[in-house]
Amino acid sequence: MEENTKEMIVIDNVDRYNKIFGLETRHPLVSIIDLAKSTTWPTRAWFRYEVYALYLKNVKCGDIKYGRQYYDYQDGTIVCFAPGQITDLEMLPNIQPNAHGILFHPDLIRGTALGQEIKKYSFFSYETNEALHISEEERQTVMDCLQKITIELEHSIDKHSRRLICANIGLLLDYCMRFYERQFDTRNGVDKDIIVRFEHLLNEYFEGDAPQNQGLP
């Protein structure tokens, strides 16, 4: 199938997503995802998200393209999407998808504290081809947060349900924000170290006889 003939799948609610992957819908506005339990899935498609989505990839089972570049995700990475974003999905043949995550509709958080703060989670609008690489300890933290939300979804809906679900989603996103900041703070430090070493090598070069013998580096 040619790229321009790929189907455009609009994920405008969580039930639509669950039907595409053969998963159960427990709540109309939020769903905890376990793609290892999926019974069907598209192999090549464009996804247009009208919900928030966060995935913890357990294995690389395909490629995800956002804009013109591919995410650099591997095992144990997190990728996030916000309403209005379009991704290009290409699944590896004969490989079961394997990822955990959460989808939630903007209506779930509308009028809540999380709804007022959602834009601070900049990883939802991250426009490069980088995913969040997490440690095993961080992965367990994410899984614990997802489990808390799962337990709440299994509970009979009452007047506390929405507040508790939103609070636990907020907790999950706060942890992810910490992980993102750790990753990029670390990377910035590495970049600075490279620049310092490069400047040191240049100084050594120009302080010796190399410029006269070999010319400019």
Predicted features by range, described:
Residues 92-157:
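A hydrophobic/aromatic-rich effector-binding and dimerization subdomain
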Residues 136-185, 189:
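Compact structured core domains
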Residues 58, 74, 83:
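A cytosolic small-molecule/anion-sensing beta-strand core signal
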Residues 194-217:
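DNA-binding recognition helix and immediately preceding turn/loop
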Residues 63-65, 87-94:
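Short beta-strand His + acidic residue motifs that chelate non-heme Fe in jelly-roll/DSBH
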Residues 1-65, 69-71:
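Generic protein-terminus/edge-of-domain signal
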Residues 68-80:
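Short acidic-glycine-tyrosine-enriched beta hairpin
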Residues 79, 84-90, 109-110:
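Histidine-centered metal-chelating micro-motifs
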